[in-house]
């Protein structure tokens, strides 16, 4: 995998250095140009020459390819489409188990529907009741179904149960 990546990177690097290939397409040039390392270029006293190739190759884009125009048009259309279409009330772009309704809709639903007394949105072994309910229930229930050994006023040791 690493060898394949290195080879493809090397090929792209080589293509960038030949005129009339990737580098020219990327910089929107319709003519070959060479920088100061790789041969002659148009002399500096020509001031309307738009490309400075000395260090970083800053340039004024000549002709913007129509693919970019199409992209801009596509983005404009997309925003219009999203404004025109109304989404159903339970819909959000999030997917998965807990995002079938948006969080705001979930709170509205939970206000509208009455839940059973021991129910909370937490899941798992220790959240079948909320912690406060567990504490209140613990005061009234006997420990694990066995009767209490200690009288109600005294402190029970942990091992008696």
UniProtKB/Swiss-Prot annotation:
Full protein name: Kininogen-2
Chief location category: secreted
Tissue-level expression: Expressed by the skin glands.
Q: Where in the cell is it found?
A: Secreted
Q: Name one GO cellular component term.
A: extracellular region
Query: Which segments does the entry list as coiled coil?
Result: none
**Per the UniProt entry, what are the Gene Ontology biological process annotations, in alphabetical order?**
defense response; negative regulation of blood pressure; positive regulation of smooth muscle contraction
């Amino acid at each position: 995998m690493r060898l394949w990546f290195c080879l493809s990177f090397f090929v792209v690097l080589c293509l960038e250095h030949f005129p009339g290939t990737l580098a020219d397409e990327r910089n929107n040039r319709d003519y070959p140009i060479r920088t100061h390392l790789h041969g002659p270029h148009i002399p500096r006293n020509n001031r309307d020459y738009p490309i400075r190739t000395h260090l970083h190759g800053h340039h004024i884009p000549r002709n913007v390819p129509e693919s970019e125009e199409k992209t801009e048009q596509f983005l404009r259309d997309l925003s219009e489409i999203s404004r025109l279409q109304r989404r159903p009330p339970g819909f959000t772009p999030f997917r998965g188990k807990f995002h079938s309704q948006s969080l705001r809709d979930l709170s509205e639903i939970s206000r509208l529907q009455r839940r059973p007394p021991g129910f909370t949105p937490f899941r798992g072994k220790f959240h079948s009741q909320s912690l406060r309910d567990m504490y209140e229930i613990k005061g009234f229930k006997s420990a694990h179904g066995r009767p209490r050994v200690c009288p109600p006023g005294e402190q029970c040791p942990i091992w008696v149960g």
